Regions:
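Short, compact, well-ordered microdomains
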Residues: 66-110
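Short helix/strand-capping turn motifs
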Residues: 2-62
Length: 110
């Protein structure tokens, strides 16, 4: 699953959740946006917040709400639970389970 922050309509940055059936990884991918634009768009969308230039905290409930209605994998919910458990075991899930720490990478082709 990828949360992208890319330049959208009218050259205004927007956040969108893509590759929703690929729960083997969860990352934040930035297109041609500044760090400030990425931080603003993430917070405005409710999907999360930047932690630093290389990591972000994604809101688990908001991410699931954005992705699940569009999921096509029959076992998507079980895959989601496995992804969250993997984040917990790797120390990337907040103590309250509300956010998942993810890597920031470039949105190739964005």
């Amino acid at each position: 699953m990828i949360v992208e922050v890319v330049t959208g309509a009218d050259e205004r940055p927007e956040a969108r959740v893509v590759d929703i059936d690929d729960l083997g990884r969860c990352v934040l991918a930035l297109g041609q946006v500044t760090d400030d634009e990425a931080a603003e768009v993430l917070e405005r969308s409710g999907l999360g917040r930047m932690q630093d230039a290389g990591t972000a905290q994604l809101d688990a409930a908001a991410l699931r709400a954005a992705a699940e209605p569009r999921a096509t994998a029959a076992d998507w919910s079980a895959q989601w639970d496995a992804m969250v458990e993997a984040a917990r075991s790797e120390g990337r899930l907040s103590a309250d389970g509300a956010s998942i720490r993810v890597q920031v990478e470039s949105a190739a082709g964005a």
